[in-house]
Amino acid sequence: MATERHYSPLDRLLLQADTAMRTLLPFSGQPSRPSPAIVQPDVELDESQTRHIAGLMRINHTGEVCAQALYQGQALTAKLPQVRKAMEHAAEEEIDHLAWCEQRIRQLGSHPSVLNPLFYGMSFGIGALAGMVSDKVSLGFVAATEHQVCKHLDEHLEQIPHEDEKSRAILEQMRVDEEQHADSALEAGGYRFPAPVRFGMSMLAKVMTKSTYRI
């Protein structure tokens, strides 16, 4: 029977550093699933549409950077092995989203946000602190974050033209995955955050969306 490998604190820090590099360096994320955009037709968008869609996809890409950092921070400090594994699995799925968003941003002639390292560091710290408090709080933070992401995705789907089936296909699949992450976190015992906490999280999310839309 296969035995589970136990990592030392140094091993985990090195793994975290490797994940951070793969998250932040261009073209370094290798998705396990092909982009949903591949099978969708190319359409011609005007300059204004292209610029706006690129801005929305940049926001979504940074959101995935934050999610990746959040999961990694929580996995580092999670108390129960099964919670750590759940965080690591969710982080692997977020790599798909990262790669898909970056591919689409490049296709639109734009680039990911230069603020990604800042948001990665902040999110990693928040995730690590949540994990140190308790696994219940950590899982609750995942659920609240993913619900916020789903809200942003819904708003973006309303703004992206129906003819841009490539961008829409990516966001629609991301929404399915994010909702599943939120449900799984709550089913695993995650704490349901009260409205004031969720409101504070939404205010922080607005700072991210406003700043990364253009840069």
From Swiss-Prot:
Residues that, per the record, bind Fe cation 2: 94, 146, 178, 181
Binding site for Fe cation 1: 64, 94, 97, 178
Record field: catalytic activity: a 5-methoxy-2-methyl-3-(all-trans-polyprenyl)benzene-1,4-diol + AH2 + O2 = a 3-demethylubiquinol + A + H2O
Location within or outside the cell: Cell membrane
Keyword DNA repair tagged: no
Pathway involvement of the protein, from the record: Cofactor biosynthesis; ubiquinone biosynthesis
Gene Ontology CC entries for this record: plasma membrane
Its membrane topology: Peripheral membrane protein
Annotated keywords: Cell membrane, Iron, Membrane, Metal-binding, Monooxygenase, Oxidoreductase, Ubiquinone biosynthesis
Molecular functions (GO terms): 3-demethoxyubiquinol 3-hydroxylase activity; metal ion binding
Gene3D superfamilies reported for this sequence: 1.20.1260.10
EC number: 1.14.99.60
Gene Ontology BP term (one): ubiquinone biosynthetic process
Cofactor requirement: Fe cation
Keyword ATP-binding included in the entry's annotation: no
Classification via InterPro entries: COQ7_proteobact, Ferritin-like, Ferritin-like_SF, Ubq_synth_Coq7
Cofactor: how bound: Binds 2 iron ions per subunit.
Family to which this protein belongs: Belongs to the COQ7 family.
Family matches, as NCBIfam families: DMQ_monoox_COQ7
PANTHER family: 5-DEMETHOXYUBIQUINONE HYDROXYLASE, MITOCHONDRIAL, COENZYME Q10 BIOSYNTHESIS PROTEIN 7
Job description of the protein: Catalyzes the hydroxylation of 2-nonaprenyl-3-methyl-6-methoxy-1,4-benzoquinol during ubiquinone biosynthesis.
Name the record gives this protein: 3-demethoxyubiquinol 3-hydroxylase
Species whose genome carries this gene: Pseudomonas putida (strain W619)
